[in-house]
Amino acid sequence: MSLAQVKTIGTSTDIRSDKYLLRQKYPQRHFHYSLKDFFSFQTNSGTIDDWNESRNILVSENFIIGLIAGLEEEVGDASGVLMYNIGQQWGQEDAKFFRSWFLKEYGYDDFSQLNLMYVLEAWWWPFIAQGWGNWEVDMSDQKNGFMFINIFDSAVARTLGDVGKPVCHIYAGLFAGFFSDLINKDLG
């Protein structure tokens, strides 16, 4: 998005002319994940909210590197476990939010009988818009109780590069927490 596309409204610079204008205009629109559709930048208050009216922050690669390096300095090798636990708690909370949002957004009573890939894509779309990366879900071993997820363009891995060890502990925790709630079984 270029600055030429951003409109100034009074003291607020917003990608939309009014906060959540597109959501108000198209309440049943499900394909709202471009930058200009998904985020509402309110410069007068210094906030960024998304389509679901959740607060977001923008961070630089230096912030990600500093956060992880600082955590490793403070707690050493336990930093991976700590990030995993943070991700797991986040995943559990996000599953509760997602279940409520999804059923309301799409008008379903329950998603236990829906196509799992449909549900998962609806869950991950906001993460893509927020910069958490694209994914590929491999369900070829589902009959044995396995699902494999490959993350591409992860902000964490891209920022840190190849450091010779796993770095996406928060993602692993996020998936464990979300899927634990989804299937009602602890996967952590």
Language-model segments: which ranges?
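N-terminal accessory segment detector
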Residues: M1-F148, D153-I170, G188
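Active-site helix/loop of acyl-thioester processing domains in fatty-acid/polyketide metabolism
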Residues: P166-N184
